[in-house]
Amino acid sequence: MPNAAANEAIIVGGLNPVEGKVFSVPTHPEADEKEVITSDTARTASNGTLEEKIRASSSPGDDTDDRYEDGEDSDNVIIITGGDAARHLLPMRDDHDPALTFRGIILASGLSCFQAVLSQIYTFKPTAVVISGTFIVLIAYFAGKAWAAGLPRGDKYEARWREKGGEGEPPLWIKVVRFINPGPWTLKEHAVCSITATSASNASASVMVFAAQDLFYDLPLSATTVVLTVISIGLFGYGICGVMRPIAVWHVDAVYWSTLPTVKTLQGLHWQELKNSKPLRYFWYSFGAMFAYEWLPAYIWPWLNSVSIPCLASMKATGETAAVLTNVFGGSINNEGMGLFSLSLDWQYYPISDVFTGGVLNETALAEYGLPRLTGTFAYALFMANAAIGALVAHCFLFWGGDFIRAYKSAKQGRYDDRHHAHMVKHYKETPWWWYVAVLVISFVIGLVVVIKENITLPAWAYIVSLLLGIFIAPLSTILYSRYGNGIATNNLSKMLAGLMLPGRPVGNMYFAAWSHNVISNAVTLCNDLKMGEYLKIPPRVMFLTQIYGTILGGFINYAVMIGIVNGNRDLLVNSNGNSSWSGATMQSYNTNATSWALASYLYGSGGLYEMVPIGIGIGAGLVVIHRIFVYFVPTIRGFSSSELNLPQFIQYAGFIPYNASQTCVIFSQVIAGFFTQFYLRNYRPRIFKDYSYLVTGAFDGASLTVLFILSFAVFGAGGPSKPFPTWWGNNVGGYYDLCPVSE
């Protein structure tokens, strides 16, 4: 699959759903069109017919069809809604194997440290690598398999002891062996290990605030500030996640489509045997093929990243003709062109330190240097991003507000429209509400202590406002992402408000954004993991402990690595170029963004050069109001429900290229791949879509990310000096990789 990675950036894992990428929410049928399930009874539909009763397996030996699918007809069902996915795509099988084990905790801790350390290291590398998703699942799989095979197994020793006549409780030494290595590496242990690592990595984005403060501002930075802030942000997001479970986790439409490849990969690795399972064989065939192929576009033959026939046909063009052709059809690197019909077969400086003294605006210096200028395309992208945020808020309330209320009422009555959650209610103790409320209170107090005691230029009242903003936006962002698998970038809203409320304080702006936007981001990620726990039948209280543990562990690990790198390479990181081993480009960009928003009252205020940017919020909301009125009078157009149109996403993508897309060459390939899988396979080959689509996708992701991870150490400069591949026509280092003409 094509990888929309930034230039010289390798993305190993899933994209952050609310960091400038795009996320959304599915249409919800009317209440009488939904199947509502209790945990142990079926109900009669509104038309008087008896709907199918959902049978949850109550023991490992329960061999009902529900352990896998709801009968043979599932193979031909077209997966459209969340109910379709719950009923026909995701099996109900629950082996009731233990989820929390000693080896699982040890491996989860090790994998969490591995992911947190590398994520933090790559933040300061010329080549960025984000380790997550299927890649982590595969590492955990082989690590668990090695543990189970390499150490004495308690189940085997106990079996031998009983064969020799042993009865009752086994001896202490067998119990110890069983505690360390109970038996085969199981699905739930594997999932808990992967989810813990994901929770630990959530802290990496928050730590960017402290790195920027330490590098660019003369403000003290203590371990207390970093660790407590990271824990406060992570836990507050988790507390919000727990409170909005009825709409973001338990709701049948909250599918989290982008996590299904991970779920199907986990289930395939543990539930299917290679010799007897055609889907699992195809998983490894796909993995092997992609592993062998990815070396070409990633290193040897970069032209495969952007195959542009128009560029090939116009290689010798010059002057204005070359410029026009490249601007239209080029797209292999940043700012080259729009990348039309291009196929991807791969997966000036502003004197910031002078203008801001001690993290606060120096108006005398500002008068001397003047205001920074934004490019027209970037200003347009900011406007569209804000319009999408306004549309998101309006769309959620005008189109799905009633659904929110019904979801909480159903949860209070013990009625569930997702059979997976109905099964969880029947067989496992739910995490009490007060646990999550306690997490919210504790994290709030921790953050307040930091704001009051530490010099971070963020007033206590602004801290409270930032959390209230996170509480308001988090449910909207999460419900959108959970239902569509992509969503709306909300990070600009927090930065804009901080800039208007805290003018001239870039450090305070960064902390404000961390306690609002990063809380939102963490809430989305943690809700995604909670839903994955329901799909894999992991007890809710185990999920609670797992995610709390990963969040706290990640705070300490990320701080330790960050402070070591910054103190050891300060001059290189502050320097605009760095070297082949270390680069402060990410921190510099982050700090520049904060600086821009710290001047919001000058740039975006009334009479400012970019005053239309914040007005975009109102325009986006107004468009959704018009859409809602249109739906009222014109509910359908030729059989298509007009309410299906999701304006927030439409608006977001209208400004996508100048704000999000570093390589436009991948867009056309993504459209083709999406049309093939989501339209053709989903509608005309539903069995192939159900059995292979997500599994093969997981294999492609895992293989390509494994190759990129190896290359980052071997040749891309992550583990030493970079070693570029020799120049040839398929690796046009001196020009554009897609061979578009270079205008003079």
Descriptions of predicted regions:
Residues 2-744:
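Alpha-helical multipass membrane-protein architecture
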